Amino acid sequence: MEIHFNNTYLEKIYLGLPVSGKPRYNIEVTEKFRKRIVLLENIENIADLRNFKGLNFEPLKGTKKGLYSIRIDMKYRLEFSIGKNKVTLLGIIIVKDLSNHYR
């Protein structure tokens, strides 16, 4: 899959670039986040996410309708939208946020 970031902070975390200020997430969360992005890059299509039961892939509701999420850990979820690349018919994942799901 093709990955695009709408969130510059998360893109810097993924690329291992320095971020200014106090870190928003601890080391364990950032490492799991990177692993999830690598997983998203390596899947063939969105339907493959359903094969990973531990990710708890789901569409979001309410004010976040149109977004999807997968689990980073019990506290954090990776929120993203899914678009289509009309030329190759590959899904394009646009990373929106890394949220504290229960706050």
What are these regions (language model features)?
Residues 40:
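Conserved phosphate-interacting/catalytic interface
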Residues 44-68:
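A short, surface-exposed loop/turn module that caps and links secondary-structure elements
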